[in-house]
Design a protein with these regions (language model features):
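Generic N-terminal leader/targeting and pre-domain segments
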Residues: 1, 76, 80-83
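Short alpha-helical segments that sit at the start of domains
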Residues: 1-12
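Alpha-helical hairpin
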Residues: 2-3, 38, 67, 317
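Contiguous, well-ordered alpha-helical segments that form the cores/surfaces of helical PPI scaffolds
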Residues: 11-16, 295-298
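N-terminal helix-turn-helix
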Residues: 13-16, 20, 27-79
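Short Lys/Arg-enriched helix C-cap and helix-to-coil transition segments
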Residues: 59-61, 85-88
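Intrinsically disordered, acidic Ser/Thr/Pro-rich low-complexity regulatory segments
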Residues: 80, 87-319, 323-337
Length: 337
């Protein structure tokens, strides 16, 4: 869609004023605050054209204009430029997240919290499913003569332990041999690869018929999976209370209930698995719970873990600033993991 330069300028200032103050914008306000070189009649005609093509709308007939979802989309795609600006709080954020980096779950939770605090919106960190993570460590630990703990350590930093109950006792020397054999044949593989090929990899080993190996071979999907770990980390909803859009308690309760249900994880992972814009606005999100919201996301990835950082807020969130914040956060997290 081709707009004149004047229409672009007027649309940009209309949206940015609404983002800042949350009130419909009149031609008089645009004239007095931004465009005194244009008459109010000229500005009014431009606003009428922008409304006609669906970029703006009137809440009431006599009120000023507010952006539509299409207006926000055009603003994000066309009217704001990418920026490599470093936020003022960068060093402080990096220091705090680095201090939490010894424990991956603590780091991800701290990241979501700081993201919400700095953006003054709702921060979310979503990590990808673990099945593509690589097995770095596997340990068999004696709990008793017939109980063994299997410990899996992934390159992402996640650890899983599961107790194996045996029908016969096992001594330390045999356990040590089996443990070393599992290390030799399984470490360096992804969990998916182990699930698909464990029987083939172990069938020629001297201990293949041992009960421990048979337990693992007969049900690899049960044992070589990282389950029960959080995949979604969130900040507090407290920041959203600063916005009039969330003052109506029923709207906020509906949003909160959705975010604290299991469906959140499924929804975000389905959304993040597709090729998509890093900004989705209102009805683009595809769920009625979010029709008055926008989500801005940014991927992060290194050798250990990958995922997305997201910020959710009202549709009038400061898109340019949020994109800068997310870029800074992904840079920090890629350095500290």
């Amino acid at each position: 869609m081709l707009l004149t330069q004047r229409e672009n300028n007027i649309l940009k200032k209309t949206i940015e004023d609404f983002i800042s103050f949350g009130a419909p914008i009149s031609s008089q306000r645009l004239h007095s605050c931004y465009f005194n070189q244009f008459s109010t009649a000229t500005i009014r005609n431009s606003l009428a054209n922008l409304e006609k093509i669906g970029m703006l709308k009137s809440i009431h007939r006599s009120s000023g204009k507010v952006p539509t979802d299409n207006g926000y989309r055009y603003y994000v795609d066309t009217l704001i430029a990418e920026s490599s600006k470093t936020i003022q709080e960068y060093d402080n954020i990096a220091q705090k997240l680095s201090a939490a980096s010894n424990n991956l779950e603590d780091l991800l939770q701290a990241t979501a919290y700081m993201l919400g605090k700095i953006s003054r919106l709702f921060g979310i960190v979503v990590i990808s499913k673990h099945q593509k993570n690589i097995l770095n460590e596997i340990e068999l630990i004696h709990l008793s003569s017939d109980r063994i703990m299997l410990v899996l350590g992934l390159n992402s930093g996640f650890i899983r332990s599961i107790v194996l109950n045996l029908k016969v006792s096992i001594d330390d020397s045999v356990l040590k041999v089996i443990n070393q054999g599992l290390k030799d044949r399984l470490t360096g593989l992804t969990l998916d690869e182990i699930q698909e090929s464990i029987k083939e990899r172990l069938k020629e080993s001297q201990y293949f018929e041992h009960e421990i190996v048979q337990i693992l071979v007969q049900d690899p999907i049960k044992h070589f999976v990282i389950s029960g770990q959080k995949l979604v980390y969130t900040s507090s909803f407290y920041q959203l209370l600063d916005y009039p859009e969330f003052h109506e308690i029923n709207k906020l309760k509906t949003l909160m209930s959705f975010f604290y249900e299991k469906s959140l994880e499924e929804y975000l992972n389905n959304y993040l698995s597709d090729d998509h814009n890093n900004v989705i606005i209102g009805r683009e999100i595809g769920d009625s719970n979010f029709r008055n919201c926008s989500i801005v996301s940014k991927p992060f990835e290194n050798n250990n873990i990958n995922g997305q950082m997201l910020v959710l807020g009202p549709k009038r969130l400061p898109y340019k600033d949020i994109k800068i914040i997310l870029t800074n956060f992904t840079d920090i997290i890629n350095n500290v993991i």
